């Protein structure tokens, strides 16, 4: 007689084993109709799974984030169902949930076209509208293998052979004549999967290994209702307009090419923004009392073995050899910073020692994962490492948090989600050390009035971590900042200091990044601002245009004056109509467009308008320069107004 405890504390007693769906029906028909799955004693279960003992139960519906994720997973199976009806010879690989949607990798000789995708989507909707039940069967490993062998599903067989224990009991989900294998849970009926869209096709290697066969990957998105789907598609349209790759080309900021995959060729205007970001962070480093250092790009393999990176990251490291020695190009800066710390005897009086670097790092990311500035192989980290004592951790972490929030606010990011990853099952150190470390991070967050969620067991083996994820104007999440405690690396690389009692102690190391990769953060900014950078970041802040050749000398004089004032200015003396010039520089997103005619030349003035088309009237050069300087010094996100 299981007793089911609901989230509000109420209890319901049943005479026999019940499913989540049974409990929902006992509460009311509306909830039964909305029930997608259940969380039983903290674990997600299919709505039809039986609960045989006393349990705590949360009923999952499409209003829950977990419910939407489940229906997305079921939409992947629905896609598989439609594919096998249209191309029975297809071999199905994997179909997981991803952010806002799902995909399925398939092995099909026929190369899919957009017309095929449209037809697939139509078939999926036809199937979903029949409202068929999804039937779950838990079988033995051998039964599952036999079922897929009979269907010629080689990839499912490979998953069973390579990833699933023969003692396991896999779950098979039957969508009428189509069968798929999954941990689940899935929707009990396809009426929940009515609001989806297939988005694109791409190539993907089986297992992500370029030595394996190239499969076709079909991406889709799915939502709980029509309105949510429509909102998402509208947001995607806006995101496409803001795509940093497209805007980067339009504004001549950078390019990438096949001969250097994942490496950025910065053009003048893009490099100007990059350097401005560096200058801004450098001022922050000075404000928070950091040393700035520069480590070598390449170090001997022996050092990477001592640090532990060779065992964990060697596949992602670029290597080379010279004079019978093997070297690795650094994928991160931390081992180099420990080497700098180790030069000369350090005392407890020298701590905390804050060491920062704009480190040029390289990681051999899979070619299929490269994506403009967002995923590259060569990147610059605004990386820092703080060497401190145990008692200094909380104060130092608190300062890191303040630095992160100060920085993000400057760029207009105010919606920051914070997560604290705590001790994993496999870890170094005793529980007392982890208790102190985790409490120090929690208290630092509390001291700054930061709300955070805890990710149990998600910390690194060498220490807990805080992650900062910013949300942009399209509510997309970008994980950028991290504060990570490290109790392992200083010890591995022999870092010590002389304590107050003259004993040798190992410092705690705090890894700290704010922007993360400058390349990626610049990509985020391009999309956040749609290329309309605030004045302080804009590569060209002012363009001065003449109406006739008569004003050419004065225009050059004006630009010279602005440049002497430290304002990034250029002129446009082309023999074109002024309306044409204004439109062209508006498309280039230059913040201020200055027009000079006879009257402005005579009065030593400029007619000022913004890229938004706002006419600010005529101003004396000194007055305009003063206003711009004020904007730049305040790092204002807005342009001057009337």
Swiss-Prot record:
Aminoacyl-tRNA synthetase as UniProt keyword: yes
Catalytic activity: tRNA(Thr) + L-threonine + ATP = L-threonyl-tRNA(Thr) + AMP + diphosphate + H(+)
GO cellular component: cytosol
Domain of life of the source: Bacteria
Amino-acid positions noted as binding Zn(2+) in the UniProt annotation, renumbered to this chain: 334, 385, 511
Protein localization: Cytoplasm
E.C. number(s) listed in UniProt: 6.1.1.3
Intrachain S-S bonds: none
Region spans: Catalytic: 243-534
Cited Pfam families: HGTP_anticodon, TGS, tRNA-synt_2b, tRNA_SAD
GO process annotations (BP): threonyl-tRNA aminoacylation
Annotated ranges, domain TGS: 1-61
Annotated keywords: Aminoacyl-tRNA synthetase, ATP-binding, Cytoplasm, Ligase, Metal-binding, Nucleotide-binding, Protein biosynthesis, RNA-binding, tRNA-binding, Zinc
Cofactor(s) required, per the database record: Zn(2+)
Cofactor mode of binding and number, as noted: Binds 1 zinc ion per subunit.
GO molecular function list: ATP binding; metal ion binding; threonine-tRNA ligase activity; tRNA binding
Statement: the UniProt record of this protein carries the keyword Zinc: yes
Enzyme class (EC, first level): ligase
Function: Catalyzes the attachment of threonine to tRNA(Thr) in a two-step reaction: L-threonine is first activated by ATP to form Thr-AMP and then transferred to the acceptor end of tRNA(Thr). Also edits incorrectly charged L-seryl-tRNA(Thr).
Oligomeric and partner information: Homodimer.
Protein family per UniProt: Belongs to the class-II aminoacyl-tRNA synthetase family.
Name of this chain's protein: Threonine--tRNA ligase
């Amino acid at each position: 007689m299981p007793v089911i405890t609901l989230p509000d504390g109420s209890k319901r007693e049943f005479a026999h084993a019940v499913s989540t769906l049974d409990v929902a029906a006992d509460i009311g028909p509306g909830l039964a109709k909305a029930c997608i799955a259940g969380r039983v004693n903290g674990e997600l279960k299919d709505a039809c799974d039986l609960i045989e003992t006393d349990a705590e139960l949360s009923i999952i519906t499409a209003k829950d984030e977990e419910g939407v994720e489940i229906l997305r997973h079921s939409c992947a199976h629905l896609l598989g169902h439609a594919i096998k009806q249209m191309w029975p010879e297809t071999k199905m690989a994997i179909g997981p949930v991803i952010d806002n949607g799902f995909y399925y990798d398939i092995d099909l000789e026929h190369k899919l076209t957009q017309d095929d995708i449209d037809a697939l989507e139509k078939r999926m909707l036809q199937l979903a509208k029949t409202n068929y039940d999804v039937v779950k069967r838990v079988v033995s490993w051998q039964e599952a293998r036999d079922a897929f062998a009979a269907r010629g599903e080689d990839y499912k067989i490979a998953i069973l052979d390579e990833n699933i224990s023969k003692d396991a009991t896999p779950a098979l989900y039957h969508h009428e004549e189509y069968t798929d294998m999954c941990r689940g849970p899935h929707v009990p009926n396809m009426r929940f999967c009515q609001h989806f869209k297939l988005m694109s096709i791409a190539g993907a290697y089986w297992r992500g290994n370029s030595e394996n066969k190239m499969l076709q990957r079909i991406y889709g998105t799915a939502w709980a209702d029509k309105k949510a789907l429509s909102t998402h598609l509208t947001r995607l349209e806006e995101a496409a307009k803001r795509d940093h790759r497209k805007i980067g080309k339009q504004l001549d900021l950078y390019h990438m090419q096949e001969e250097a995959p994942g490496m950025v060729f910065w053009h003048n205007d893009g490099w100007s923004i990059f350097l401005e970001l560096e200058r801004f962070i450098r001022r922050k480093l000075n404000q928070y009392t950091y040393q700035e250092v520069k480590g070598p790009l390449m170090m001997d393999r022996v050092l990477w073995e001592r640090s532990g990176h060779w065992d964990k990251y060697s596949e992602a490291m670029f290597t080379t050899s010279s004079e019978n020695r093997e070297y690795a190009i650094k994928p991160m800066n931390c081992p180099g910073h420990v080497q700098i710390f180790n030069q000369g005897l350090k005392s407890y009086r020298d701590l905390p020692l804050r060491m920062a670097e704009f480190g040029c790092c390289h990681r051999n990311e899979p070619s299929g994962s490269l994506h403009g500035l967002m995923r590259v192989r060569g990147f610059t980290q605004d990386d820092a490492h703080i060497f401190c004592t145990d008692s200094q951790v909380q104060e130092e972490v608190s300062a890191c948090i303040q630095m992160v929030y100060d920085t993000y606010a400057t760029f207009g990011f105010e919606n920051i989600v914070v997560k604290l990853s705590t001790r994993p099952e496999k870890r170094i150190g005793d529980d007392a050390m982890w208790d102190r470390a985790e409490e120090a991070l929690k208290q630092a967050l509390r001291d700054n009035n930061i709300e955070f969620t805890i990710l149990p067991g998600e910390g690194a083996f060498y220490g807990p971590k805080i992650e900062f994820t910013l949300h942009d104007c399209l509510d997309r999440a970008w994980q950028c900042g991290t504060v990570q405690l490290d109790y392992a690396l200083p010890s591995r690389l022999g870092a010590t200091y002389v304590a107050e009692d003259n004993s040798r102690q190992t410092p705690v190391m705090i890894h700290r990044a704010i922007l993360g990769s400058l390349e990626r953060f610049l990509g985020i900014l391009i999309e956040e601002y749609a290329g309309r950078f605030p004045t302080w970041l804009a590569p060209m802040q002012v363009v001065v245009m003449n109406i006739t050749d008569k004003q050419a000398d004065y225009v050059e004089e004006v630009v010279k004056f602005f440049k002497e004032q430290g304002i990034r200015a250029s002129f446009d003396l082309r023999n074109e109509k002024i309306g044409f010039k204004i439109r062209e520089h508006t498309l280039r997103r230059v913040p201020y467009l200055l027009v000079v005619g006879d009257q402005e030349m005579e009065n030593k003035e400029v007619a000022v308008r913004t890229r938004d088309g706002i006419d600010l009237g005529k101003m004396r050069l000194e007055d305009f320069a003063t206003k711009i300087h004020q904007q730049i010094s305040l790092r204002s996100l807005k342009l001057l107004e009337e």
